[in-house]
């Protein structure tokens, strides 16, 4: 297991390599700046030049990187990946960080599904506050997600090939295609004097996906007039987070 500084170097190097797949800039040319609460973004000149938005998250051995060709749209993008830890006592946390409607919906589920829903909601909430750039300065109880009308789809995840990276293993460049569970049509509401008030039309789009039984990811996009389209690629950087 590498220390935090080494892991951070790998993540930054990988981010630069991936961004260079989307624009004619070499990995060492990318320049970043940070929002008031620390959200990373491209410097203004490169944002205007490339039209790219990005956000990233990591958990365990997984790194999730979201990249969007936003063009001139002023959008907010946030992603999160979460591990459903069996050691977490979820119930004391509910009333501190979840909206009343989220708590009620979770507790109405069979007990064997409540832990999964907890981490589903946590991933969604993290993706939203990361999109806004407010981080934990925004109360997690001040907004809530509703999965009661979520639609299940499948999202193909293909193996990315041709990455010019020392971490990439060409030996795994086979016809691998995974079908991920993906949920769309997730509602988002905001607290209004102690109750949840639904905002219509909702300027936010969120989706929830599962990599496997233990890991799920969420993507939240704000400010776009177009439906969110996802293209999932699996990149195998040897020892990136090990």
Residue ranges and their predicted role:
Residues 1-242:
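Core catalytic alpha/beta fold that binds nucleotide/phospho-ligands
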């Amino acid at each position: 297991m590498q220390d935090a500084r080494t892991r951070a170097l790998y993540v930054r190097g990988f981010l630069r390599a991936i961004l260079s797949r989307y624009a004619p800039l070499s990995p060492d040319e990318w320049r970043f700046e940070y929002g008031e609460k620390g959200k990373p973004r491209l410097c203004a000149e490169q944002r205007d030049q490339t039209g790219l938005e990005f956000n990233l998250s990591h958990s365990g051995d997984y790194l999730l990187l979201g990249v969007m060709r936003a063009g001139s749209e002023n959008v907010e993008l946030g992603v999160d990946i979460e591990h459903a830890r069996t050691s977490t006592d979820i119930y004391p946390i509910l009333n501190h960080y979840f909206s009343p409607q989220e708590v009620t919906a979770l507790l109405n589920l069979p007990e064997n599904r409540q832990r999964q829903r907890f981490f589903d909601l946590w991933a969604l909430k993290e993706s939203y506050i990361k999109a806004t750039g407010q981080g934990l300065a925004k109360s997690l109880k001040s907004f809530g997600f509703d999965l009661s009308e979520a639609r299940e789809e499948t999202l193909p995840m293909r193996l990315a090939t041709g990455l010019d990276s020392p971490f990439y293993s060409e030996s795994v460049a086979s016809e691998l295609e995974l079908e991920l569970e993906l949920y769309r049509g997730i509602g988002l509401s905001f607290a209004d004097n102690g109750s949840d008030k639904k905002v219509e039309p909702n300027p936010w789009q969120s989706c929830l996906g599962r990599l496997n039984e233990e890991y799920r990811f969420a993507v939240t996009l704000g400010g776009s007039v177009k439906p969110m389209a996802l293209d999932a690629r699996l990149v195998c950087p040897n020892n990136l987070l090990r």
